[in-house]
Design a protein with these regions (language model features):
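Conserved alpha/beta-hydrolase
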Residues: 72-92
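Short beta-strand element of the alpha/beta-hydrolase
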Residues: 47-57
Length: 237
């Protein structure tokens, strides 16, 4: 399996809790990609604990909101992991910053694999949390994995739909979809010629005055000291 270069110092965008213990862990999915995660355990906990795997939002890293969710749930008595999806953050996989519903659904199932074999986890009490664009991935995983006993989708956004139809279905027409395919195909040609891959996504910068409120909310988190992280595509894309 791929050897990862993991940062050992605390580099989250939120303060470290004195109620939990934290460590870096790794696990692999069925595609052979090694994933990096932060594990949060209630301090002083004994016996087998309920566990939760957390990931998202789309384009974010575990040092941002997913880690905050994981740490908070650990304060409430759960053993938790917040993980970087395949191709993202400290996790493995190339080319970087690829999103795939199949692989990213598998990432959640792989997180359940990992949690299921931990000595201090009750394998009959494992849940998952998917945030924003990862809410859909969490629901996908829960639909196929009977080991997942509880699922929460927080502020879920359907990334497959927005990719196909645009925000607010603004590109939901035969002509718009054809033009999008033409642009993507032309970009493939250019990528092959240049030997690099063009990145899409991220948060618009500078922020237009007429941007929708949800885009302003994205900007206020990912592009400011409140939520900026150097490994996050949302912060740097």
């Amino acid at each position: 399996m791929e050897k990862l270069n993991l940062t050992q110092e605390w580099d989250k965008v939120f303060p470290k809790s004195d109620k939990v213990d934290h460590k870096k862990v790794t696990f692999h999915n069925r595609y052979g990609i090694t994933l990096a995660a932060d594990m949060y355990t209630p301090r002083g906990a004994e016996g087998k604990l309920p566990a939760i795997a957390v990931s998202g939002p789309f384009g974010a890293v575990k040092e941002q909101s997913s880690g905050l969710y994981a740490q908070k749930m650990a304060e409430l008595g759960f053993l938790t992991i917040a993980f970087d999806p395949s191709y993202t953050g400290e996790s493995g996989g190339t080319p970087r910053y690829v999103a795939s519903p199949d692989i990213n659904t598998e990432d959640f199932c792989a997180a359940v694999d990992f949690l299921s074999v931990q000595e201090n986890v009750d394998p009959e009490r494992i849940g998952i949390i998917g945030i924003c664009g990862w809410g859909g991935m969490a629901i996908n995983a829960a639909a196929i994995d009977t080991r997942i006993k509880a699922t929460a989708a927080m502020t879920m956004y359907d990334m497959t739909r927005v990719t196909a139809n645009g925000y607010f279905d603004a590109e939901d027409s035969e002509q718009a979809r054809f033009e999008k395919k033409k642009a993507m195909n032309a970009q493939r040609t250019e990528d092959y010629r240049s030997g690099t891959y063009a990145l899409a996504g991220g948060v618009v910068d500078p922020l237009p005055e007429d941007a929708p409120q949800f885009v302003k909310d994205y900007y206020a988190y990912y592009k400011t000291p409140r939520g900026y992280h150097s490994r996050s595509l949302n912060s740097n894309g």
